[in-house]
């Protein structure tokens, strides 16, 4: 049994996550964690609400409340939505949790004591109109490297370069739109150049995917610069360094350490305060991070540097799955323009399994992907229903009507039978290969392909005719078919957990499809002759043929219902 930490990027809870946030980290991480559990691995799956920093502070001021009132509502609501999406966290926590706050302060002091944190004056953006120092993300200007006119003060979303606000051309305040000034303020910095050699050695020897590894090595070629770890805003974890009164820890350093503190909190809940070290200090532990591509520098450079700089034997990232962007009907999701679908709106439209399946099929693994309602309709009606749902229903209904719900004894295998049995046995191995490469879209593709082969097999064998002329051949066909359905149930479990469990019950199989170690039964003939199946039901339901044309006109009413359910401080 292997030991794994599956880490999803922490959603920033100044708003409800949208579909792009969901597939970029949380859902992908959940599918992978569920797969590992099915394999019988020892898994801790962690994430939490990222709730510090100026964006939330500004939103709270706008609403006339303390930031914690806002994040209390947001955290509980988002946590509930993830539960409804069947996200199987072992611990979903928050950056306001006392365990996290204490851990961050202790960790940052270790970096300080080890000589990796130093103090110096910094020149920071200040908005004279709003009378406040601005966080990097609240400064917008032209990127000095690529000329992108909407680059942020910490990073250009176009070319991906990490920036300092002073590098931007024509910097402006994103709150009021006015020009910013730069004023001196004392701050504490993480000495990344001092750790560059160690980070580069680790990167070159790592098994990170090419998009992450190459991007990070290119950044190292330019040379790392010290990064400020403190901010002047009030809402955050107080900086622990001598003389740093009134400063808070920069939210990125705060949130990155959440993966460890969440594991620590998980151990405390289980009554074992040292459990987290059995994962994080064990060189055999594999740590897999699920993030969006814009977060690569923080996870592939800054986090490893922090872990190395601590002097403790932390295991460094084993794999970083960084997705490209999911667009919505050709444009980026936008809260201000109400452009996109947010996860509570999605659940108002259809149950979670439909979204889980469709989003994994659209997962932007190699390039930006466009969510369209027409593609969503095709996936639901063709792949979920025609390919998988229809096949399952054909098999179970035939056994119910022609064999009295009892799985028949097979006869000798024809070439077609042998070929289909081979497909049943080999599909889990192919899906497993894609899972190990964190190519979840392709793994789900193997599940769909097995169902397609099943439909073709039934059409070729025509058991509805053979039951009259060669009942033994029909029995063989249905014996193999029902076992392929059992394999489908196991393979679907990471993707559509509720539907997979319902299918397991329809097959009248013992226990839960989600039991640890269940994966080893995929591809095996686990349903024996004489087994009685349960009552067949429709696994999925089709959407109306004009769903993609009509959904736009229905969104306004859907959003009205959703807004009524949202906590008051999360209504737009």
From Swiss-Prot:
Q: Which reaction does it catalyse?
A: tRNA(Met) + L-methionine + ATP = L-methionyl-tRNA(Met) + AMP + diphosphate
What Enzyme Commission number does this protein have?
Answer: 6.1.1.10
An annotated Gene Ontology molecular function: ATP binding
Enzyme class (EC, first level): ligase
Gene3D superfamilies in the record, alphabetically? Answer: HUPs, Isoleucyl-tRNA Synthetase, Domain 1, Methionyl-tRNA synthetase, Zn-domain
Please indicate if the UniProt record lists Phosphoprotein as a keyword: no
Q: Which family does it belong to?
A: Belongs to the class-I aminoacyl-tRNA synthetase family. MetG type 1 subfamily.
* Name of the protein in question: Methionine--tRNA ligase
Q: Which gene encodes it?
A: metG
């Amino acid at each position: 049994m292997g030991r794994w930490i599956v880490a999803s990027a922490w959603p920033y809870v100044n708003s409800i996550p949208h579909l792009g946030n969901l597939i970029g980290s949380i859902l992908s991480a959940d599918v992978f964690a569920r797969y590992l559990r099915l394999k019988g691995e020892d898994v801790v799956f962690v994430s939490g609400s990222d709730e510090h920093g100026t964006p939330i502070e500004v939103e709270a001021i706008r609403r006339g409340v303390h930031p914690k009132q806002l994040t209390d509502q947001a955290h509980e609501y988002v946590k509930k939505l993830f539960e409804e999406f069947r996200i199987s966290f072992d611990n979903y926590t928050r950056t306001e949790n006392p365990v996290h706050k204490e851990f961050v302060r202790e960790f940052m002091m270790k970096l300080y004591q080890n000589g990796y944190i130093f103090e110096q004056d910094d020149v920071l953006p200040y908005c004279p109109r709003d009378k406040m120092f601005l966080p990097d993300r609240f400064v917008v200007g032209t990127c000095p490297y690529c000329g992108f006119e909407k680059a942020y003060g910490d990073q250009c979303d176009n070319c991906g370069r990490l920036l300092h606000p002073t590098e931007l051309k024509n910097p402006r305040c994103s709150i009021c739109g006015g020009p910013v000034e730069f004023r001196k303020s004392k701050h504490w910095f993480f000495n990344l150049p001092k750790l560059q050699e160690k980070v580069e050695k680790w990167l070159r020897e790592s098994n990170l995917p090419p998009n992450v590894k190459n991007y990070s090595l290119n950044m190292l070629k330019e040379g790392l610069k010290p990064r400020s770890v403190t901010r002047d805003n009030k809402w955050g974890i107080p900086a622990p360094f001598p003389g740093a009164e009134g400063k808070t820890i920069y939210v990125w350093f705060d949130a990155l350490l959440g993966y460890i503190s969440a594991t620590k909190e998980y151990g405390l809940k289980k009554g074992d305060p040292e459990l987290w070290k059995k994962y994080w200090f064990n060189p055999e532990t594999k740590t897999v991070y699920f993030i969006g591509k814009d977060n690569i520098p923080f996870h592939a450079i800054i986090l490893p540097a922090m872990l190395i700089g601590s002097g403790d034997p932390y295991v460094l990232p084993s794999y970083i799955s960084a997705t490209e962007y999911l667009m919505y009907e050709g444009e980026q999701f936008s809260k201000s323009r109400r452009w996109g679908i947010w996860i509570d709106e999605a659940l108002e439209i259809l149950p979670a399994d439909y979204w889980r399946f469709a989003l994994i099929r659209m997962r932007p693994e190699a390039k930006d992907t466009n969510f369209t309602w027409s593609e969503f309709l095709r996936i639901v009606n063709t792949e979920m229903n025609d390919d998988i749902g229809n096949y399952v229903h054909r098999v179970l209904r035939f056994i119910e009507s022609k064999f009295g719900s009892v799985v028949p004894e097979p006869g000798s295998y024809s070439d077609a039978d042998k070929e289909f049995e081979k497909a049943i046995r080999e599909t889990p191995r192919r899906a497993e290969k894609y899972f190990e490469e964190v190519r979840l879209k392709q793994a789900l593709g193997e599940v769909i392909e097995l169902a397609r082969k099943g439909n073709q097999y039934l059409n070729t064998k025509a058991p509805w005719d053979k039951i009259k002329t060669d009942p033994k051949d029909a029995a063989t066909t249905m014996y193999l078919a029902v076992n392929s359905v059992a394999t489908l149930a196991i393979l679907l479990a990471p993707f559509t957990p509720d539907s997979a469990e319902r299918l397991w019950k329809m097959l009248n199989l013992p226990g839960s499809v989600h039991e640890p170690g269940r994966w080893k039964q995929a591809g095996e003939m686990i349903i024996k002759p004489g087994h009685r199946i349960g009552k067949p039901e429709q696994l999925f339901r089709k959407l109306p043929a004009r769903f993609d044309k009509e959904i736009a006109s229905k969104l306004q009413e859907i959003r009205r219902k959703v807004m009524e359910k949202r906590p008051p401080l999360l209504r737009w």
